[in-house]
Structure formats: C-alpha cells, structure tokens
Amino acid sequence: MSMVFAALGALLLCFSPDMGYSARVMAYVGAALMIQLRLLCNLFDGMVAVEGQRFTKSGELFNEVPDRVSDTLLIVALGYALPSLEWAIGVSWLAALLAMMTAYVRLLGASCGLKAEFLGPMAKQQRMAVMTGALLLSAVWHNGAVWLLSGALLVIALGSAWTVGRRLHKIYGLLERS
C-alpha cells in the first residue's frame, strides 16, 4: 500500500507543472499527504510484524523493496516537478540513487554480521521530512516553490551522500575492530 501512496504522490508532482495556481497548491499538499500516508503504512507494517510477532523468512524483502521503490518514485518525481531547471531531473535521479545507497550500505553492514546502522543525517524519515516540508512551504509561498523544491532536492542528494559516507566509515571501523 505504501507504494500506491508513493505513486500517487509522484503523479501529483509530475503533473504539477502543467496545473494552474490553485491546482498546483492542492497537488503540493496532496503529495505531502501521500508521503505521510506512505510512511504511516511502513510504520504500521513494522508494528504489526513486531507486536504481533508475525515474522517470516521473506519479511525483509517485503519491508525493504517497497521502501526503495517508494523513495525512488517520490524523489525522481520531485525533479520532474521542476521543468524550468534543466539540472533538476539529473539531480533527482542522483538523489534517488544515493537514497538507495543509504539502505544498501546499511544492509551490507548487516550482511557482514554487524548491527544495522541507521546513522543520518539523511535516512528515510529525514528525506521524506525534507520533501514534505518543502511541498507544504511551496503551497504557502508559491513564488518560492522552485527554490524550495530544488533546495530540498539538493539537501536530499547531499545529505544522502553524507549519510552513505558516515555509514561506510562506521561499518569499516566496526569491521576492523572485530
């Protein structure tokens, strides 16, 4: 279900440049809402698994894959919401790749027998908070939407790169000391 909300949010973002003022404001608010609903689905799924002790051997697949798809849909769509900036689409794909790398590095450390490292500064929750904040501010300050959304995209890309570096450094240190 989280991927459905992410896809709806991504569609709102992708079509927002062709909308009039009022519709674009509603698209920004709607996309922010879809992001939060996507996160709630993820939270409830985890709570059901932990509290109900409903773990399966394939549970991690159903936890991780939808997150990666959802992140990619939303982050890439943010670039497509900025057609006036020729670099935005490329940066959105880079940001999505770096976001995926944060999860990859975390899982790589776990596959080496270490505890999963959820170090930030730009883990999933922070990426989605940056997007949500930028979308809601853009709905209020429409003239600044391009700056707010492109700023969010850059923050997500740079923050994700920093997060990958921090996680790799921590995992390297733990492996060398073990």
Over which residues does each language-model region extend?
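Active-site His/Glu-centered metal-binding helix of metallohydrolases
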Residues: 40-48, 61, 65-69, 73, ...
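Basic, amphipathic juxtamembrane/active-site segments
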Residues: 47-90
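Glycine-rich active-site/cofactor-binding loop and its immediate structural neighborhood
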Residues: 24-63
